[in-house]
From Swiss-Prot:
Disulfide bonds: none annotated. GO terms for cellular component: small ribosomal subunit. This is Small ribosomal subunit protein uS12. GO terms for biological process: translation.
């Protein structure tokens, strides 16, 4: 605990918070180009082939981003929009690709949580 005299000499240092998504540079989303689209295996105890993409962002960073939903149309040179948000069982994956924007198609036949996967309302015939 500093004394009053010490506080007069120099003020308290402000604590700086470290961001969880530095590549976004304080923006809600960032555009980027896929450099590689591949699958990755999660940490123990989970088992799957998670779809991920390596993306070069307009901010100059190259990051790994998760492709949510079932099935996707992404390939190399696809232009995508990224948001923050990590995938707990994939180390190093701190971003999500936003479905239904730019070159990323929405999830087909999605009926619930449609807005999160860029799916249009189903036609009721």
């Amino acid at each position: 605990m500093p004394t009053i005299s010490q506080l007069i000499g120099s003020e308290r240092k402000r604590l700086t918070r470290k961001t969880k998504s530095p590549a976004l540079k304080s923006c809600p989303e960032r555009r980027g180009v896929c450099t590689r689209v591949y699958t990755s295996t999660p940490k123990k105890p989970n088992s799957a082939l998670r779809k991920v993409a390596r993306v070069r962002l307009t901010s100059g960073f190259e990051v790994t981003a998760y492709i949510p939903g079932i099935g996707h149309n992404l390939q190399e040179h696809s232009v995508v929009l990224l948001r923050g948000g990590r995938v707990k069982d994939l180390p190093g994956v701190r971003y999500h690709i936003i479905r239904g924007t730019l070159d990323t198609a929405g999830v087909k036949d999605r009926r619930q949580s449609r807005s999160k996967y860029g799916a249009k309302a189903p036609k009721n015939d």
